[in-house]
């Protein structure tokens, strides 16, 4: 699974003009299931995201996690994180997981974060969503579950 993680002051996702998920300080996580992801990819990625120390401590160093600050997580599916831009001008997405399994892994990821005690809001898998955010820092981190055994 791939994730683009943004430290935010606030974030919101809307579908057809209606807000379906909103958080204050915390993380906006855009997530994509990749073909061949193992069954435990969602839980492993969730554990890494929950412990990622990208929030400031009293010494102004990035030394706190979203759990440490009592923050929330907004999880939004984004299959375009699987984009292959190596050739041509139109990205390919063949490395993204099939929609049925992709949605299952996306939901497992959100549930795994909840199981770790985090308040979690979600977007709508496969929907045309509008995501607004205030990136704090800015801090944006790329994470791929395949990068770590």
Curated annotation (Swiss-Prot):
Domain of life: Bacteria
One Pfam entry name: Tyr_Deacylase
One of the record's GO molecular function terms: tRNA binding
Motif Gly-cisPro motif, important for rejection of L-amino acids, residue numbers: 137-138
InterPro entries: Daa-tRNA_deacyls_DTD, DTD-like_sf
Catalytic reaction(s) noted: glycyl-tRNA(Ala) + H2O = tRNA(Ala) + glycine + H(+); a D-aminoacyl-tRNA + H2O = a tRNA + a D-alpha-amino acid + H(+)
Localization of this protein: Cytoplasm
A Gene Ontology term for the protein's cellular component: cytoplasm
Gene Ontology biological process terms from the UniProt entry: D-amino acid catabolic process
Enzyme Commission identifier(s): 3.1.1.96
Record's keyword terms, sorted: Cytoplasm, Hydrolase, RNA-binding, tRNA-binding
Enzyme class: hydrolase
Predominant cellular place of this UniProt entry's protein: cytoplasm
Gene3D superfamilies the UniProt entry points to: D-tyrosyl-tRNA(Tyr) deacylase (3.50.80.10)
PANTHER family, sorted: D-AMINOACYL-TRNA DEACYLASE 1, D-TYROSYL-TRNA TYR DEACYLASE
Similarity comment: family membership: Belongs to the DTD family.
Domain notes: A Gly-cisPro motif from one monomer fits into the active site of the other monomer to allow specific chiral rejection of L-amino acids.
Task of the protein: An aminoacyl-tRNA editing enzyme that deacylates mischarged D-aminoacyl-tRNAs. Also deacylates mischarged glycyl-tRNA(Ala), protecting cells against glycine mischarging by AlaRS. Acts via tRNA-based rather than protein-based catalysis; rejects L-amino acids rather than detecting D-amino acids in the active site. By recycling D-aminoacyl-tRNA to D-amino acids and free tRNA molecules, this enzyme counteracts the toxicity associated with the formation of D-aminoacyl-tRNA entities in vivo and helps enforce protein L-homochirality.
Quaternary structure (record): Homodimer.
Name of this chain's protein: D-aminoacyl-tRNA deacylase
Species assigned in the record: Paracoccus denitrificans (strain Pd 1222)
